[in-house]
Amino acid sequence: MMFVYVISKDGQPLMPTSRFGKVRRLLNENKAKVLKRCPFTIKLLYEPKSLVVQEVVLGQDTGSKHIGTSCVGNDRVLYQSQVELRDDIKSKMDGRRQARRFRRYRKTRYRKPRFLNRKNSTKLDRLPPSVRHKVQAHIDEIEFCKKILPVSKIVLEVSQFDTHLMKNPSLIFETIKHWGYQKGFDYGWASKREAILNRDRYMCQICGKKHTRLEVHHIIYRSNGGTDDENNLITLCEDCHSGIHNGKVVLFKKIKRLNLKPATHMSIIRSQLLNVYPDAIETLGFVTKTNLENLCLPKSHYIDACVIASGGKTFEFNDTIYQKRRVPKGDYQLTKGVRGEQKIPIGKIQDFRKFDKVKYFGKEYFIKGRMSSGFAILMDIFNNKIDFSYMPKGYKTPKLSNLERISARRSCLCISQRIIPSIA
């Protein structure tokens, strides 16, 4: 069941309604106005005789890539959403850093190098931009729900991971637990290089040579996202090492990848959310899994959030889910710089920007790209390009003049989808 969310005259959230006829009459009689189209929210322009709100519980399934959020009241799902987070922040900042360094090399070639002069790096409790985005996305979704619904309680599914134990499961034994956390892979060695050579028995791992000059080689290069982890390092002789870089030797060794970034991010997200919402109730993943199995429900982020908010009790499903995706706020490279009396570009072509929500032949899309010739490339909320090859001639590539803009670009794209949840 789809709901219309209601805000009182003084800005306080009220219980949502499914009486669309009454909402239509209020809008026609100028007793209410539209605040938001997705999700559809109205604000009353008069004081009702009585304001009664019920208890609404907000449940959130925290995550490093996706967030599931649900609000449950009177054993009914009043709101449910699934947010896809950004994963391009680090790569974009790496590109910025590379361009900045190359620019300074060109512009100030003979100037003494400067480094460690960033004020932001000296801030107390500073978070990396990629982690800060994920924490802020969780907070934004909670605050959004509190604006449209009278949330009285917050339940968070959070987790805390022991990354040392994930890398070395033997730390679970009491006999080595008290000292194992202080002794890593290269403990007792002067450098990681010596530890790698000792692990590989001072022998080339391709040809088996010994008693020769040995090199420690990155299996996945640092330029391709490789790390200095011991699983990514291998011992090679000088001939095999130069042969790999010359393309004459192929390294077939597979590394055991243990990606600990999501686990680290989840631990940080937990601590930050509990600092912002100290009254929130914590729950764990195995509790949600048990409740899902008891209710015979499939695994999904928004269904997990519904189970978290309901506390494992039965509830009435909502057939509307709000799919959201976080995107950059703007294309800043197009709008910055000293320009004198030149007009500052705003990144618009015929009043359209990238990520604008538009309507084309009755369906809603987002702008993926624009052409100065007046055409556009459209996509869905999951960044999939829409193919219009089935359209008649003249409409296979959408024209900007045929598009109707629904909403301007925002940092969070949103679209409503009708679903039929499978409870088999």
What do the predicted segments below correspond to?
Residues 4, 55, 197-201, 212, ...:
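Short metal-coordination and nucleic-acid-contact micro-motifs, chiefly zinc-binding Cys/His arrays
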Residues 13, 17-51, 185:
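Charged, flexible boundary elements
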Residues 51, 72-183, 187, 251-354, ...:
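Substrate-contacting helices/loops that form the catalytic groove of nucleic-acid
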Residues 54-73:
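Gly/Thr-rich phosphate-binding beta-strand-loop-beta motif of the actin/hexokinase/Hsp70
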Residues 79, 383-400:
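A short macromolecule-binding patch
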Residues 205-238, 242-249:
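Histidine-centered nuclease catalytic patch
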Residues 356-357, 363-377:
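Short beta-strand-centered aromatic/proline hotspots
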